[in-house]
Amino acid sequence: KYKTKSKIDPLNFFSKLSKTNLAPEAFMIRDKNYSIISCSPENLITKKGSNISTKPIAGTVKKTKYLNKIKALSYFRKNLKETKEHNMIVDMERNDLSKICKVGSVKLSKQKIVEEYKDLFHYVSLIKGKLKKNINNYEIIRAMMPGGSVIGCPKINTLNLLNNQEKENRNIYTGSFGYIKFNGDMRFNIIIRSILNFKNVSEISVASGVVVDSNANHEFNENFLKAKALIDLFK
């Protein structure tokens, strides 16, 4: 968690961020008491009619002049830690969707693809399903939140463990922001890569997935990499 005292212009920050690190789930909230500027790349729920999808991210590598999108895909496929982490999260999200979807309808639409951002590449999958009859939005949100990629597996046990281990509240971090239409369609992201400014204190939270093959130094450096686009706004 990075913190700094700063009086910021949320609209200016968001405008800069949209130009330098455009992300599909980006958003900004400006209130008289606080503001949130986000370049979140991760979609948790997209519901249109009876169709639902989730797009978990699990896997990160630094972007360099020697590492293009094709080489990044090769890196992810050969890296045992990244593969284990990704498989774990995908399995968990498929399980969450299976609670609310018709039997046999949950499918991997896109499996282990690479998405490119300003400073990094992400390892991403897209999972789709057909909702059971009479499933309401409350049941969907309850089944899908919090997102598996920011919790871990097994979900309930990990949540209990995190409650005991984490000394500070996450605030908005790893929550969700989105909308529900009058027709019931909805879209929610996962709040990562975000700045929370409250009482002229800006806060950036980052984290990484840990499995048995994880290396502490690698995970620490990955966290800084994830925060870099946001930290650069203060320069």
In which residue ranges do the predicted regions lie?
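Extended alpha-helical targeting/anchoring segments
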Residues: 1-235
